């Protein structure tokens, strides 16, 4: 259900704004999106796993907060994030 360290490093590398960037909103949204996709796939075979579903809702809420922050700061970056990670608004 969680992502591997190698996959996380790859996601960070592809979404970093500069080298060594691990905390920008873009990177955080990318990591959360990866975890959300993994959990969504998990629920296809474990539909009654309500404990993990609660964690999924928390991840979605955190990602929504980060996206709201990016939208407030820079609308173009926000739209690029939505398009890049196929996030519905």
UniProtKB/Swiss-Prot annotation:
Cellular component annotations (GO), alphabetically ordered: cytosolic small ribosomal subunit
GO biological process, one term: translation
PROSITE patterns named among the record's database cross-references: RIBOSOMAL_S15 (PS00362)
SMART domains membership: Ribosomal_S15 (SM01387)
Superkingdom field: Bacteria
Gene Ontology MF terms: rRNA binding; structural constituent of ribosome
Keyword Nucleotide-binding set for record: no
Biased composition (Basic and acidic residues): 1-11
Keywords: Ribonucleoprotein, Ribosomal protein, RNA-binding, rRNA-binding
Keyword Metal-binding listed: no
Location of the region described as Disordered in the Swiss-Prot/TrEMBL record: 1-25
Disulfide bonds: none
Pfam families: Ribosomal_S15
InterPro entries found in the cross-reference section: Ribosomal_uS15 (IPR000589), Ribosomal_uS15_bac-type (IPR005290), uS15_NS1_RNA-bd_sf (IPR009068)
Subunit structure comment from the entry: Part of the 30S ribosomal subunit. Forms a bridge to the 50S subunit in the 70S ribosome, contacting the 23S rRNA.
Membership in a protein family: Belongs to the universal ribosomal protein uS15 family.
Chain's role: One of the primary rRNA binding proteins, it binds directly to 16S rRNA where it helps nucleate assembly of the platform of the 30S subunit by binding and bridging several RNA helices of the 16S rRNA.
Listed name of the protein: Small ribosomal subunit protein uS15
